[in-house]
């Protein structure tokens, strides 16, 4: 749950009326409460503090107080802080993202998270505002707690000098694409910071959830967006070229970088600066053609780039790498944004066929997490694509209404 690199200009919605903060809290059925500090932890500014809020009170529902005891910080950045907390009333562990809130504006992350509900997207439980003695206003987003990140899982294998087993690569990347297919089609959201640190992993079930929507935005065709977005190693080339009218295909590039990193055990494009990032990409994909440059940013077509030949994909990965893995990576990491496959197309790729086999299980014999409970993201999918996405055994199990099948 890390922040994007460096301070970024936030694209904010039009300022709401002055009472908007209180109204936002009221519409959420949540009243503002002052942050109550309880110095039980060490010198840490968070550990041991208790945050109380009132929920309910709508539709005849009784109001009740919920208190959270902050346990440890799990992420910090320019956005604020994320900490693990325990609900004192229920004992449930949650993650709370606490961000300084400008009273003049709505919080985009909150608006987007309220609109999303999917097994592979982090769930917003509720939110509330808190204030400090200096009258600073903070928004607290209370989310489900998932203990691991893909970054830490990969680091575990790297430290042991091992490659991540292919079954886990398939399972994690498939679920990442399922989450992207949902956010790209249903709420129409572009995440804009897909990276291993923002992919949560449950170590018991191996369910994956996309998190940190602090950089996310609904992209409107013809409306400019900032290009300084997305962490460097995962930044699509059109962003490096300064494009402002990009599409959700920037997330597809980032996911392709994550796939390659899981297969290699290290980042595919480890640039040390924005320019060096482009050099790293050119070393693998070769120099972009004039047409490819035009697709990324028409203003750069007259620039002279050193002519470098593409490095064959099969030479980038080790000899035993399945050709399906290499084929998928090559379909994701294309210079032309429109040539990258969609997230739903990626889910249907043959690299993931093992997950669709009737008796497929986790290495420990336990069942996979839900993989086929698609919802509205299939609304515009062709019958042929749906046929590739939903295995026969799932279709038989759930009858004809397979678009809503659970696994």
From Swiss-Prot:
Domain Protein kinase: 68-352
Description of what induces expression: Induced by cold and salt stresses. Down-regulated by drought stress.
Catalytic activity, as annotated: L-seryl-[protein] + ATP = O-phospho-L-seryl-[protein] + ADP + H(+); L-threonyl-[protein] + ATP = O-phospho-L-threonyl-[protein] + ADP + H(+)
Region span, Disordered: 1-21
Protein name: Shaggy-related protein kinase GSK1
Keyword set, alphabetical order: ATP-binding, Brassinosteroid signaling pathway, Kinase, Nucleotide-binding, Serine/threonine-protein kinase, Stress response, Transferase
Upper lineage: Eukaryota, Viridiplantae, Streptophyta, Embryophyta, Tracheophyta
GO biological process: brassinosteroid mediated signaling pathway; cell differentiation; negative regulation of brassinosteroid mediated signaling pathway
Enzyme class: transferase
Superkingdom of the source species: Eukaryota
Keyword ATP-binding attributed: yes
MF-aspect GO terms: ATP binding; protein serine kinase activity; protein serine/threonine kinase activity
InterPro entries: GSK-3, Kinase-like_dom_sf, Prot_kinase_dom, Protein_kinase_ATP_BS, Ser/Thr_kinase_AS, STKc_GSK3
Region forming the signal peptide: none
Subunit structure: Interacts with LIC.
Binding site for ATP: 74-82, 97
The family this protein is said to belong to: Belongs to the protein kinase superfamily. CMGC Ser/Thr protein kinase family. GSK-3 subfamily.
Consequence of gene loss (knockout): Increased length of spikelet awns and weight of seeds. Increased sensitivity to brassinolide. Enhanced tolerance to drought, salt, cold and heat stresses.
EC number in record: 2.7.11.1
Keyword set includes ATP-binding: yes
Role, per record: Probable serine-threonine kinase that may act as a negative regulator of brassinosteroid (BR) signaling during flower development. May have physiological roles in stress signal-transduction pathways. Phosphorylates LIC in response to BR perception.
